[in-house]
């Protein structure tokens, strides 16, 4: 894996954090691979396919629970799996405002993201996060 590959994946993780904050489809959906069975596992459940991940997880769960959310990725490591696949591992924390009470809230945990190369670009294929 080249340094430009690593840097592109690191930028992808930053873009993912930004997309969680904005919750806009135009920020979130282009991050994901096309023609693959994308998935997301979290304490909130298991979600399959980019549209379901966006609609049911990001908007339906995260957006419904928090008036504001900042996802903070810390100590991101990129590990190659094959020439066209890599894993990003990191600790995360959230800084949120609960929609129901207006109170600050946050969680922390570990996240694993699987990235695949498509057309020379690194795209997200799978996310697994766990709360600590």
Question: What are these regions, as identified by a protein language model?
Answer:
Residues 16, 23-26:
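Short helix-adjacent coil turns
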Residues 106-132:
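Short beta-strand edge/turn micro-motifs at domain boundaries
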Residues 78-87, 102, 115-123:
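A short, structured loop/turn motif at beta-sheet edges
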Residues 4-8, 25-84, 90-91, 105-106:
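A solvent-exposed, acidic/Ser-Thr-rich amphipathic alpha-helical stretch
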Residues 10-18:
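Amphipathic alpha-helical repeat scaffolds
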Residues 21, 94-98, 115:
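Beta-strand elements of well-folded, non-transmembrane domains
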Residues 32-33, 92-94, 128-131:
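Short beta-strand segments enriched in hydrophobic/aromatic residues
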Residues 76, 94, 110-114:
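Hydrophobic alpha-helical segments of small multi-pass membrane proteins
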């Amino acid at each position: 894996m080249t340094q430009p590959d690593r840097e592109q994946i690191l930028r992808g993780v930053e873009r993912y954090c930004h997309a969680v904050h904005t919750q806009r489809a135009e920020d979130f959906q282009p991050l994901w691979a096309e023609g693959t069975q994308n998935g997301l596992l979290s304490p909130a459940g298991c979600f399959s396919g980019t549209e379901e991940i966006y609609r049911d997880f990001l908007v339906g769960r995260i957006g419904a629970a928090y008036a504001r959310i900042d996802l903070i990725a810390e100590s991101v490591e990129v590990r190659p799996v094959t020439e066209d696949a890599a894993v990003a591992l990191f600790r995360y924390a959230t800084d949120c405002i609960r929609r129901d009470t207006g109170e600050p809230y946050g969680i922390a945990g570990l996240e694993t993201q699987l990235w695949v190369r498509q057309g020379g670009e690194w795209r997200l294929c799978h996310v697994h996060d766990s709360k600590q």
